[in-house]
């Protein structure tokens, strides 16, 4: 039986593993399955499928289960590379209309063929030599633009987020585990302006509000839907189960496990 594989080949500059998408990312799932939550929607990829997670959005990949197979290739289209590409190829941008945070691209034989052509470039560690990063990223980007010219309006839009409705944005995105300065940037504000506007709306500091909202959701999920604490803490924006349990008890006077056990006895 084949051993479970959870492997990622990254082509491009290193990226910080966080729930803020700082650069455009092209995903190709070589084998297995992967899923994630980008913007306000769930997405899933199966073997041979691919898509683009767009920059300046919030998103997270669901952790692979113990026996799952997930082998994927990620191309990072960072801004310096895209600017150089645009200058070299004299790209004329078109208007890009989709607001989706994760773009499922239509099936086309060119993409799998390109991925297959990477085979000879892998070293013994299963990685592609950095000397070929730009060449291969350029080749893939040319294919994508040939298949969907309107993607030029996505890749070559170097603008920064504009000021938006902070209350609506936070009520929609508070479960994402990102630093407050990321929330400020995505709402088109400096950090000081964000904190000032936030307090004027919610009458609470961002950090306290975020923890309280996440814990209130946790209480409802455990009490009403009988969810297990270990199954929900990551989706609610907590990094560690121990921190989640400590914060939960401080707010509600009992641990999430105690609440779950009480609910189980009542069933």
Task: Give the role of each language-model region.
Residues 1-96:
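N-terminal regulatory/effector-sensing and dimerization cores
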Residues 1-7, 74-125, 193-195, 242:
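N-terminal/domain-start segments enriched in small and hydrophobic, helix-friendly residues
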Residues 25-28, 110-117, 136, 143:
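Amphipathic, well-ordered alpha-helical segments in soluble domains
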Residues 48, 194-198, 243-248:
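Short hydrophobic/aromatic patch on the recognition helix
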Residues 96-109, 122-187, 200-205, 212:
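Short, Lys/Arg-enriched, Trp-marked, Pro/Gly-tolerant hinge/linker segments that flank
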Residues 168, 172, 177, 181-182, ...:
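Terminal helix-turn-helix DNA-binding modules in bacterial transcription factors
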Residues 187-191, 239-240:
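Short coil turns linking two alpha-helices in DNA-binding domains
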């Amino acid at each position: 039986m084949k051993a479970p594989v959870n492997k990622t080949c990254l082509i491009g500059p290193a990226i910080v593993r966080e729930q803020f998408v700082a650069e455009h990312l092209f995903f190709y799932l070589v084998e297995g399955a992967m899923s994630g939550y980008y913007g306000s929607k769930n997405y899933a990829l199966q073997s041979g499928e691919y898509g683009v997670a767009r920059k300046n959005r919030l998103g997270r990949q669901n952790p692979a289960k113990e026996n799952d197979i997930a082998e994927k290739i990620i191309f990072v289209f960072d801004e310096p590379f895209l600017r150089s590409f645009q200058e070299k190829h004299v790209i004329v941008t078109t208007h890009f209309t989709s607001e989706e945070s994760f773009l499922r691209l239509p099936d086309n034989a060119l993409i799998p063929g390109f991925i297959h052509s990477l085979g000879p470039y892998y070293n013994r560690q299963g990685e592609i030599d950095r000397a070929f990063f730009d060449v291969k990223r350029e080749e893939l980007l040319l294919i994508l633009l040939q298949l969907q010219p309107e993607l030029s309006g996505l890749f070559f839009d170097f603008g920064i987020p504009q000021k938006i409705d902070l209350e609506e944005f936070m009520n929609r995105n508070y479960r994402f585990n990102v630093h407050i300065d990321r929330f400020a940037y995505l709402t088109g504000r400096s950090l000081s302006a964000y904190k000032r506007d936030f307090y004027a709306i919610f009458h609470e500091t961002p950090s306290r509000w975020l923890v309280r909202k996440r814990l209130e959701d946790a209480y409802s999920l455990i009490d009403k839907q009988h969810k297990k604490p270990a199954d929900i803490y990551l989706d609610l924006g907590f990094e560690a189960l121990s921190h989640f349990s400590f914060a939960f008890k401080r707010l509600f006077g009992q641990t999430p496990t105690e609440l779950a056990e009480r609910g189980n006895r009542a069933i």
